Amino acid sequence: MEFGVAMFFTDYAMDAGEFAQAAEQRGFDSVWAPEHSHIPTSRLSPFPTGGDLPKKYAECMDPFVSLTLAAAMTKTIKLGTGVCLVVQRDPIQTAKLVASLDQVSRGRFLFGIGGGWNAEEMADHGTSDFKGRWKLVRERVEAMKAIWTQDVAEYHGSLVDFGPMHARPKPAQRPHPPVIVGGAFPYGARRAIAYGQGWVPHGSRPQYGDVGQFLPEFQKMAREAGRDPADIPVTLFGIPADLDRLRYYRDAGVARVVVSLDSAPADKIVPRMEKWAELRRRLAE
């Protein structure tokens, strides 16, 4: 089981490039950058984990900028959006961002995507149909795949529609970077099986259940859909610093766990990263 590390990159947190270097040096396989464009002051949508919304949600940098810096300062570590809010982004421009980052990183990008939870934030981007947002996500992903894989690309859906176009660069990874779909079981799992190359559930939200218990059913669902479960690896966010729990996830079939660290300077982040690296080493014994 691989270990990744995530942070809301802000102007008061550890630099994204230095963060990625430190993670690469300590054996983490991936760095992840979340996304929120802004937080409306009139927000009514509840924070999924309860309580007050941490200020870093309104203050994080654009994930593609952070990951480009991380790419420039590292050689092997993978670079993921954790997650990109596709409902708030133009698919043509986002397809170019993804392909460009995959090229400058020499094929290290992981395209984590999600539907989001903040209805007011989405509405400011013109996405007012909160309940129907996943249909928009799917069409935008399908449209981006067309742009990445076709010399002359076009897409005609009910929500996304464009005629033949030339769009380069194409991604370094072929046919494209893995699209890793976020969401709880069973709906997120079904979406990952339908159009993803990975699934990202969350481990610290008890209302969504125990991911480890769902994995046999997830694998069965994948096979019934004609897909090899190995082609849809599970990346789990929201994990405890508990060796027994990590063993449980590993033995259940989780491919990667991602550690979320606070938005803080290097003198606070590096020691925490060291502790997680030690847990990773102990797990491998």
Language model regions located:
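Active-site-adjacent structural elements that line small-molecule/cofactor binding pockets in enzymes
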Residues: 1-285
